[in-house]
Every structure is written in C-alpha cells, then in structure tokens.
Swiss-Prot record:
Its EC number is 1.11.1.9, 1.11.1.12. One of its GO terms (cellular component) is cytosol. The lineage of its organism: Eukaryota, Metazoa, Chordata, Craniata, Vertebrata. Catalyzes the reduction of hydroperoxides in a glutathione-dependent manner thus regulating cellular redox homeostasis. Can reduce small soluble hydroperoxide such as H2O2. Can reduce cumene hydroperoxide and tert-butyl hydroperoxide, as well as several fatty acid-derived hydroperoxides. Cannot reduce phosphatidycholine hydroperoxide. InterPro entries: Glutathione_peroxidase, GPX_AS, GPX_CS, Thioredoxin-like_sf. Homotetramer. This is Glutathione peroxidase 2. One of its GO terms (molecular function) is glutathione peroxidase activity. Belongs to the glutathione peroxidase family. Transmembrane segments: none annotated.
Length: 190
C-alpha cells in the first residue's frame, strides 16, 4: 500500500516549470485539483472552465491541473511540450492556462502521485456518480486496480480552506458547475 499523507498540507507537487508546489501555502484557500489531458475530447471545454473559475476567485481559489497519460494516452506530450500543445493544438488559438499545471504523473496504480493516493483515500468515489468506473477494461494500463481509481480524464477534487477534502466530481460533471460548492466553502453569497 502506498504511503498516504496525514494532511493535505503535507503534500506537494512539481510544477511544469520544475519548481516545487508546497500545499502548505494553500492554507485559507479552496483548492480544485483536476487530472487533465491535452488531447481529450473535452480538453477545450474543461481547460476553458478551469480558467474561468481561477479568474472568478483569483485570491481565494487555487486551481491545479495534473497532466496524466493513463487514459487513452491523451497526454502523450513531454512536460516541456504541454503548454505549446495547449496553445497551438488543442485547446489552440493561443490558449494559456491561468492556473498551475504540474508535471505529468500517474493518478492510479502502483506509481500514483501521493496527492491522488490521499484524495482517493478521503473521497473514494465521485458524489455525482458513485458507480463511476472505467468503461472499457481494455484501457486499464495500471496495477493494482482499485474501486476508488480515477476513471478518466478530468475528474475533479475540491478541498476546503481548512485543507479538508470536500467533494469529488466525475468526468461528466462540468467543471464550471463546481462554482456553487466553491462559493459555499468560501462563504461567498451565491
């Protein structure tokens, strides 16, 4: 069994720029974590909505995208190619994320990133689709397989300002529709 952090604030990641992202600096802010892929069918929609949420809550929300190639090999770029892929291919049109992206990682299996080991332990399935599973077993390329595994690109995890995982959302739940939960956590009038 992989090590699972005791607290959200004990976690960290490495950004696309190679710098450490220390989650301890997120105290007092809500955090939205989403596994992303630049060649998925919903890349344009999801990246646009992540940008929108980051812009609506610039100081009180941290949005982190974790590129992952475990679902249909839809993030097959190297770390240094991801931003150019988003800018010129899909999303395209000069798109630039307004939120932080980490280096590519696994979200499932033996080599899963500690952030996802922690989040899946605290939130074992999406609240909007508790029966969500990988739809095509032939696409499972990791081991071991667990019921709590992320099932595809663009699954989301929302963490409250005290570092408590609040809710997990399936890939079919549109990112922008998380806004009421963010407002609730930040106690902003809806």
């Amino acid at each position: 069994m992989a090590y699972i952090a005791k607290s959200f604030y004990d976690l960290s990641a490495i950004g696309l720029d190679g710098e450490k992202i220390d989650f301890n600096t997120f105290r007092g802010r809500a955090v939205l974590i989403e596994n992303v892929a630049s060649l998925u069918g919903t890349t344009t929609r999801d990246y646009t909505q992540l940008n929108e949420l980051q812009c609506r809550f610039p100081r009180r929300l941290v949005v982190l995208g974790f590129p992952c190639n475990q679902f249909g090999h839809q993030e097959n770029c190297q770390n240094e190619e991801i931003l150019n892929s988003l800018k010129y291919v899909r999303h395209g049109g000069g798109f630039q994320p307004t939120f932080s992206l980490t280096q590519k990682c696994d979200v499932n299996g033996q080599n899963q990133h500690p952030v996802f080991a922690y989040l899946k332990d605290k939130l074992p399935y999406p609240y909007d689709d508790p029966f969500s599973l990988m739809t095509d077993p032939k696409l499972i390329i990791w081991s071991p397989v667990r019921r709590s595994d992320v099932s595809w690109n663009f699954e989301k995890f929302l963490i409250g300002p005290e570092g408590e995982p609040f809710r997990r959302y399936s890939r079919t739940f549109q990112t922008i529709n998380i806004e009421p939960d963010i407002k609730r956590l930040l106690k902003v009038a809806i």
